Amino acid sequence: KKDWRKLRELNHLSEVFDAYDTFVIDLWGVIHNGIKINERAMEVVDNLKKNSKKIVFLSNAPRPSAKVINFLLTMKMDKQYLSNVMTSGEAAMHAINQNKFGKTFFHLGPPRDASIFEKVKENKTTIDSCDFILCTGLFDEDDADLNKPKLHENDLDYYKKFLSKYTSKKLVCTNPDFTVHRGNKEEYCAGYIAKIFEELGGKVTYYGKPHKEIYDMCFKANEKVLAIGDNLRTDIKGANNLNKDCL
């Protein structure tokens, strides 16, 4: 565990540029807020690039990396910074495509996340007949698979009742975050649904921060890494688990 006495206060990230080869940077909450880019953060990223540092954007987005790159481009981020983007959705997608948890799955999440199972979409089925539950988030109110329109995103009791009958199935969580802020609005993420499932007695496999597997896809063990994020439970815990410095 990190020793709190070794904490150091920085005025600017440039003070520690020379100490690290690789900077692993969270996206949502650091680089953008779901609506617009943080221009001051991008000034730092640009400075890192000019100093020939390896920049890895690591996100718990439950979608493939290519989808997140496209999203960043729509927010006018220059593609020169996007050489290394890894998402929890990308990591989960590889496992799903290899039938790691079985063949058939039930998608618990909004239709916009369907890109994660594009290559195996024919294996999507009902929750009663599936091999595993693929959780990318909460249902949207217009999700045709639900047959219950007007489900409110904050109705967590619904999810407790809905999942209570299926705790014998495996649940794969593609975003360990509990909540996210989209602008000024706080929204629940797949991690909160996975937490409910575990409290009911179900077993969950997580993809994304703070779990080690996704970091193995971002850098080698001998790289001098600084992880930058806004979430103690995911960004900071993940770095601490690997004994890497964090900000």
Language-model features: locations:
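HAD-like aspartate-dependent phosphatase fold
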Residues: K1-L247
